[in-house]
Design a protein with these regions (language model features):
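NAD(P)-dependent short-chain dehydrogenase/reductase
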Residues: 127, 138, 150-201, 206-208
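NAD(P)H-binding glycine-rich loop region in Rossmannoid oxidoreductase-like domains
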Residues: 57-94
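Conserved Rossmann-fold NAD(P)-dependent oxidoreductase catalytic core, especially the SDR/UDP-sugar
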Residues: 75, 101-140
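N-terminal Rossmann/SDR dinucleotide-binding element
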Residues: 1-72
Length: 209
């Protein structure tokens, strides 16, 4: 049975991914500091192949000891989004950059690393982005995640996924994401307010990530 270690596994994407992995026969360990609580993963505790470790990716020693023995490391732990990163810029860089360095340094060389990066790394682009499109992040979020991605790609057995803006229901629901916000407003307030009309975004359902 393959063993999967997920940093930030109690978050929006992680809480969606965990039950899918369990259903498909993986043993899953979530490593999370529960900064947004643990309600999104609590239903998994009844599964015999689910494990939880409360920890922070900035705690290098605890992180490294927890990573041992796993086949795949999925690194999702981060300060996510423009607004959250602006609230504490220094901490955002520590988590998104130094925290990622800590993850990479804890790998044993045989483990596969899957990194949850972001389309915010591209910045303003004319046309369709590809893997070869130069990165020009504009926000603190994009800059800190780009630094993290650079560290990840130094590791030979790694893949980085530059996610589009996610939407859809999750056990750890986020209403600050654009499509979720508009859906909530339409249902509860009976109207939506469209803002930043000059911006263009790509979207992906959280279950398609």
């Amino acid at each position: 049975m393959k063993k999967v270690f997920i940093t930030g596994g109690a978050g929006y994407i992680g809480a969606t991914l965990v039950p899918l992995l369990l259903k498909n026969g993986y043993e899953v360990t979530v490593y999370d500091n529960l900064s947004y609580g643990g309600d999104g993963i609590i239903h998994n505790f009844s599964e015999p192949t689910f494990n939880f470790i409360k920890g922070d990716i900035l705690d290098k020693q605890h992180l490294h000891s927890s990573m041992k023995g796993h086949d795949v490391v999925v690194h999702l732990a981060a300060i996510v989004g423009y607004t959250a990163c602006r609230m504490n810029e220094a901490h955002s860089y520590r988590v998104n950059h130094q925290g990622t360095i800590n993850v990479v340094e804890g790998l044993d060389g045989d483990q596969l690393l899957l990194y949850g990066s972001t389309g915010s790394n591209y910045g303003t682009v004319d046309g369709i982005c590809t893997e070869e499109t130069p990165l020009n992040p504009l926000s603190i979020y994009g800059k800190s995640k780009t630094l993290g991605e650079e560290e990840v790609m130094k590791y030979q057995n790694s893949v980085a996924f530059r996610f589009a803006t996610a939407f859809g229901p999750s056990p750890r629901l986020r209403l600050d994401l654009l499509v979720n916000d508009l859906s909530y407003s339409a249902h509860i307030q009976k109207y939506i307010a469209v803002y930043e009309s000059h911006f263009m975004r790509t979207f992906i359902h959280v279950r398609d990530i």
